[in-house]
């Protein structure tokens, strides 16, 4: 097959059980009220709900690579991967986020292979966990390289600081994350300019916000990102064709937005490399994922799973975000 299906999904607080042996003491104390009632049965239910949707992706073949955020640990991530089938494996690095949630990848090992390095656990995917300098620790930016049919490509997962405390007050933190991303994209451009890179994440900002356009150098102009004459390594925002659609990836105060996005570097827009299949960007949205109460889907909102300690706990739910997906093609 000359097609690769990539997706991104904010899993909404996929934590390990309430009193997990894998959780640090400081985090256990911090989360004890939030995770009250989050037992093995609830975790199994949450994983089952997520797994059901993930398996439906890519015409029920499942994604070839899925970027995720709001997953607590390697331990719980491996449980999710196992629920998808034995062909799936994970790419993960612990971060110092103040709520203990990370970004990661799940990939189909029958189709793509990560670059490996030797570790205490034996050969593991080689990752670069780029720290975002912030007073209160946030998620690192996770970078990995994979091989598909002999061709390398890079994937980078983001979960930028939230809008907690207000959009404007928190904006500098996301600008900092954008600057960090741009720095590493600049290094990739300098050292490996012909390697395609797909950047994905929950940026907690819209495509038009400064953190993306001015700091991460994301653009909605395909020609600007594809140009070899551009002085800076611009990223084409693949979400561009979806802007203005009736449904986004997240709903806040009755308005759909596009906090979850995918971006591509210049090499990923070149048909001589692994490249983005133009027009393939899509939001994964259906009657299961959106709670619309017999109204049109755009009038509903993502059906949250939440947690037992919340009055909004819904064991039939999934996440407060919708997944977004793209396709990549082999060189022509």
Which ranges hold each PLM region?
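Metal-dependent phosphoester/phosphodiester hydrolase catalytic core
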Residues: 20-22, 28, 149-156, 160-179, ...
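Extracytoplasmic/secreted cell-surface and envelope-processing proteins
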Residues: 75-76, 99, 164-167, 207-210, ...
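Beta-strand-turn-beta hairpins that frame and shape the catalytic cleft
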Residues: 1-6, 15-18, 110-113, 136-164, ...
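N-terminal, active-site-proximal structural segment of metallo-dependent hydrolase catalytic domains
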Residues: 1-101, 291-302, 311-312, 329-332
């Amino acid at each position: 097959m000359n097609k690769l299906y990539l997706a991104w999904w904010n899993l909404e607080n996929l934590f390990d059980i309430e009193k997990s042996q894998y959780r640090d003491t400081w985090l256990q104390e911090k989360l004890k009220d939030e995770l009250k009632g989050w037992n093995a049965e609830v975790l199994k239910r949450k994983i089952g709900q997520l797994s059901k949707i993930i398996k439906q992706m890519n015409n029920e073949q499942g994604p070839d690579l899925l970027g995720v955020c709001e997953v607590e640990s390697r331990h719980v991530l491996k449980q999710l991967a196992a629920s998808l089938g034995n062909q799936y494996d994970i790419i993960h690095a612990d971060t110092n986020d103040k709520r203990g949630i990370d970004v990661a990848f799940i990939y189909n090992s029958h189709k793509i292979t990560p670059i490996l390095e030797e570790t205490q656990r034996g050969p593991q995917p080689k990752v670069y966990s780029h720290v975002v300098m912030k007073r209160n620790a946030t998620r690192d930016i996770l970078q990995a390289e994979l091989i598909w049919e002999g061709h390398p490509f890079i994937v980078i997962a983001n979960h930028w600081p939230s809008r907690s405390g207000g959009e404007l007050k928190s904006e500098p933190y996301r600008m900092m994350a954008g600057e960090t991303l741009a720095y590493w994209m600049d290094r990739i451009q300098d050292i490996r300019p012909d390697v395609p890179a797909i950047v994905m994440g929950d940026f907690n900002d819209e495509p038009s916000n400064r953190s993306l356009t001015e700091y991460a150098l994301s653009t909605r102009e395909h020609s600007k990102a594809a140009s070899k004459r551009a002085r800076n390594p611009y990223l084409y925002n693949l979400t561009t064709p979806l802007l203005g659609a009736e449904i986004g990836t997240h709903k806040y105060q009755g308005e759909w937005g596009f906090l979850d996005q995918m971006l591509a570097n210049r090499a990923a827009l070149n048909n001589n490399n692994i490249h983005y299949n133009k027009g393939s960007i899509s939001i994964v949205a259906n009657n299961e994922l959106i709670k619309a109460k017999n109204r049109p889907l755009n009038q509903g909102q993502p059906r949250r799973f939440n947690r037992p300690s919340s009055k909004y706990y819904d064991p039939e739910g999934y996440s407060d975000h919708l997944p977004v997906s793209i396709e990549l093609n082999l060189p022509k």
